[in-house]
From Swiss-Prot:
Protein name per the record: Phosphoribosylformylglycinamidine cyclo-ligase
Organism: Burkholderia mallei (strain ATCC 23344)
Entry keywords, A to Z: ATP-binding, Cytoplasm, Ligase, Nucleotide-binding, Purine biosynthesis
A single cellular component GO annotation: cytosol
Cystine connections: none
Protein's cellular compartments: Cytoplasm
Signal peptide interval: none
UniProt family annotation: Belongs to the AIR synthase family.
Amino acid sequence: MNPPKSAPDAQGLSYRDAGVDIDAGDALVDKIKPFAKKTLRDGVLGGIGGFGALFEVPKKYREPVLVSGTDGVGTKLKLAFHLNKHDTVGQDLVAMSVNDILVQGAEPLFFLDYFACGKLDVETAATVVKGIATGCELAGCALIGGETAEMPGMYPDGEYDLAGFAVGAVEKSKIIDGSTIAEGDVVLGLASSGIHSNGFSLVRKIIERANPDLSADFHGRSLADALMAPTRIYVKPLLALMEKIAVKGMAHITGGGLVENIPRVLRDGLTAELDQHAWPLPPLFQWLQQHGGVADAEMHRVFNCGIGMAVIVSAADADDALRQLADAGEQVWKIGTVRASREGEAQTVVV
């Protein structure tokens, strides 16, 4: 068989010519290894670079149930690109998944990330991964693997997308599923650190309309920093609370806000009645509502409105839970109670 003929004067092509820089990928791995190493914990077997990451379930679990979660950061990334601010979105990525699996009572064990871009910028990617490692440290889980995908033509230069994957464990007898929630139980609200990672399509629309100076002072920091504040990670204080108090249900307040997330842990026939005056609406949400002309009902179904996690306990345990969470450094309020639903009523109402 004759070899294929080359076009006249054609030069040989390389992967770099196609837009993929293998050397940049190798440089990134070298940069992020120290970040990942700081997250190592008991159970990690082997180092970074294998085809698969190995983790041994801690021996303290008699009947371990694995709990998994995956999420992204959404269009908060578009604001990160606009501001050229990439140091906080990694923590957002971790928080979205570890807070989700925490709701079932799970201790996060390990985390994996996926970073996709059109052209790999090593410094930007390393900054993002450093934030991921920070989030893993705050959650007590190991960053044991990930994927960096450089895909020319898929994303504009300077842009990327993120996905995260968390796996945790809970004792089978201690799974939290909301089945014990009853009338008279108390809903506690833990303060958010800001907008977290939901509602940014509306945030960006409000910014487009208001055209504010994002570098201007906003309650002691720039408006940009207030908007980009990383999602709070509630793992350690809530795992400690679960050791002392029977937590009946939890809801991570993400897309859908308070009114759509709390019902996910309530049995049919129960409603959580929340008092919107029980906690202060943070200045950032006041700013968004004012400049966007957003109705109260829309605020409560899009944004967390200052509450990042809801915890449901018995009335008898409520004061102890408040005290323990406050001692752990959390801002927390009694924001509502559980009662029987009325005919045709939603499972969470804000009054």
